[in-house]
Structure formats: C-alpha cells, structure tokens
Swiss-Prot record:
InterPro entries: Chromo-like_dom_sf, Chromo/chromo_shadow_dom, MRG, MRG_C_sf, MRG_dom, MSL3_chromo-like. Residues 3-77 form the Tudor-knot domain. Signal peptide: none annotated. It comes from Candida glabrata (strain ATCC 2001 / BCRC 20586 / JCM 3761 / NBRC 0622 / NRRL Y-65 / CBS 138). The lineage of its organism: Eukaryota, Fungi, Dikarya, Ascomycota, Saccharomycotina. It is found in: Nucleus. This is Chromatin modification-related protein EAF3. GO terms for biological process: DNA repair; DNA replication-dependent chromatin assembly; negative regulation of antisense RNA transcription; nucleosome disassembly; positive regulation of transcription elongation by RNA polymerase II; regulation of DNA-templated DNA replication initiation; regulation of RNA stability; transcription elongation by RNA polymerase II. Component of the NuA4 histone acetyltransferase complex.
C-alpha cells in the first residue's frame, strides 16, 4: 500500500517517472483520502469505470503540468527505491537503444519503411499504461488506450477514444525517446535550441503536405490535409510561448520575439536575422513533437469543435507521426543531434531560472 503524500515511480508509456501521490481511493474505508484538502467546488474526479474494490492512486508527475495528473491502479506504480530507480534508468537506456536501432533501420530502408512492419506494426508500446508488459487489460480499454472495437481502433501505434472526452495520442517509441533526450538535455545539461533550426516546423509541415499531395488523388482529402497543416502551424505559433517551452528556454524566446531596446542594440547579426520570423520558422522537429504530445489536451479544451473535426485532426496527426518516423534521420540525424542545442552561460541561467 502506498501512502498519501508519499513519492513513487509511475509508468507513463514505456518509461518510469517520479510522482507524488495526492489522493488515494481506499476500498476498505470506501472513501478518497487526501494529502491536501480539495478546493471549494473541486471534485475528486474518480473514474466511473474503476474497480472500487481495489486501491487507486491520484498522482502528480514531478516537473509536469498538473493537467497530466491522473488516477492509476496499483500496477502502474512502484516504490521509490534504489533498485527501481536503476530500472527507471535502464528503461531510458533501452528506449535510446531502440531509437538508434530504428533510425538505422530507417536509414537502410529496413522494417521502418511504410508498409514494412517495424514501428508501424509493433504491438502497442504504451501497454505499460495498462499495467505491466504487453498485457492489455479491460482497464486499459476503459481508459481509451486500447479500444476493443469501433471506428477509433485505427492502428497499433496510436489509438484514441471520445467516449469520455479524454483524447490520447501514443507517440512511436523512436520519437518518444527523442522527447526524453530533449527533456534531459534542456533540464539537466542546461542547453537551449540553436535558432534558426535548419529544418523548422513550417518547412517540415510543408514537406509533409507535398508528400501527401503526390500520393493523394482525392481533392477532398487533399483539402483536409492542407487545412490540417495550416491549423497545426497556427497552433504551434500560438502555443509555443505559453505551453511548449521549458523554463530555461523562455528567456531566449522573449529575447527573440520581444527584445528590449537594450537587447536589440546588443544583438549579433545572426540574432538580428531572426527578427520578424514566426516561431514555426525557427524551432525544429522536437518542438513540433512537444506540441503533438499535448495536442489531445488542447483539443479537449476546444469548445464547439465537433467529434468529426477532432477525428480528422487525430487521423492526420497519426499520418504525420508515421511520416516523421520514416524521415527522422533526415530531420534530426543522430550525428548532428547535439548541434540542435547550444550551451548557456551562467549569467543566462541565472536570469532564466531566477537564481
């Protein structure tokens, strides 16, 4: 039994993350136990489908936004022990190895090519969310991770469910591991993105549209893709300042897009060349992946967007993710991965982090 207010490790996708237990459903007492009392008008948010004869835990992932807080069953969490911390590190290393192996296959025209199996036809690598190993239990289906039937069971790489207004996108492991690396490089190594990126978001999305256009004969489908690409560009440019940057990166963003007169005078020629450009013309594929990772939450909060429109967005996001897997070696080759970033000075860190 895990204590309310205590720390643990929790599976989110194939990896383990440190988390804090905020609430606990106690089946013996038949009530929710809290570490902090609920605010006025706040509900406990117990899932209707949960088995009330078992313990459930409402957790907050350390360093994540509170919007990712969720109820999980006991098979999703582990004690915060040295042995389990080592397991956490091992899973990260395995994800990195899988990423490199997949990149090599993609480069050699192997199983990652479209229609050739590999990452596109793997069993759901997010199965950890429903317990351990590859087990797909009924609880996973109830949460919409592995729909058992219906029109939303579109692929093994990602699945989504509108039944409880909870949308999910499962990012292929090769891309997910890159997001893990990205997080570590920015938050641990204190590096920020080199701007402009040689393959900025808008260029990537334009290439995606052109590739789809060469294979699509339906004018209606092509129009939908064009609208999707346009909308995603707008989402990116609007969201990056508030939602997509780590704390260390925000100062750079402010200096580029909202410089003070003093900062403008001190700009280098390269920094001046960034003036007037949109974020989508400067940031690269990893920041696009950050957007995709929170896209379900953004769509869930869009008032007035109907199910059909959301379904179209998710369907094209699935196509975009698979397209990125096929071309990630071109967009972010391993040998130049580190050049995506630049070191920060102690002065920059002090201002950016408020030290």
């Amino acid at each position: 039994m895990f204590e309310v207010g205590g720390k643990c490790l929790a599976y989110h996708g194939p990896l383990l993350y440190e988390a804090k237990i905020l609430r606990r459903w106690n089946p013996k007492l038949e009530k929710v136990e809290y570490s902090v009392p609920l605010k006025s008008g706040e509900e406990d948010g117990l899932p209707e489908s949960m088995n009330r004869e078992e313990f459930y835990y409402y957790i907050h992932y350390q360093g994540w936004k509170s919007s990712w807080d969720e109820w999980v069953s006991v098979d999703r969490i582990m004690e915060l022990t040295e042995a389990n911390i080592e397991l956490k590190k091992q899973l990260v290393m395995e994800a990195k190895k899988a990423s490199l192996a997949q990149q090599q296959k993609t480069k050699n025209g192997g199983s990652a090519k479209r229609g050739g199996g590999g990452a596109h036809s793997e069993s759901n690598h997010g199965g950890r969310r429903s317990g351990s190993g590859d087990r797909r239990d009924s609880n996973a289906e109830e949460r919409g991770i592995v729909p058992s039937e219906g029109p939303f069971r579109t692929s093994s790489v990602m699945s989504y469910n509108f039944s409880r207004n909870k949308l999910r996108i499962h990012i292929p492991m090769i891309l997910e591991s890159m997001l893990v690396d990205d997080w570590e490089i920015v938050t641990k190594e204190k590096k920020i993105s080199n701007l402009p990126n040689p393959f900025p978001v808008e260029t990537i999305l334009d290439r995606f549209y052109k590739d789809v256009a060469t294979r699509t004969t339906s004018p209606v489908e092509l129009s939908l893709v064009e609208e999707y690409v346009y909308g995603l560009k707008q989402y990116f440019n609007e969201a990056i300042g508030n939602l997509l940057l780590y704390k260390l990166e925000r100062l750079q963003y402010e200096q580029v897009f909202y410089p003070t007169p003093e900062q403008q005078q001190a700009m280098t020629p390269v920094e001046r060349s960034l003036s007037g450009r949109r974020p989508g013309q400067l940031y690269g594929v990893l920041h696009l992946l950050r957007l995709i990772s929170i896209l379900p939450e953004m769509l869930s909060n869009c008032v007035g967007m109907d199910t059909q429109a959301i379904n179209v967005i998710l369907r094209h996001t699935e196509k975009l993710l698979l397209w990125l897997v096929d071309r990630i070696e071109d967009l972010l080759p391993h040998k130049v991965h580190k050049s995506y970033y630049t070191n920060t000075s102690s002065q920059y860190e002090g201002v950016a982090l408020g030290l």
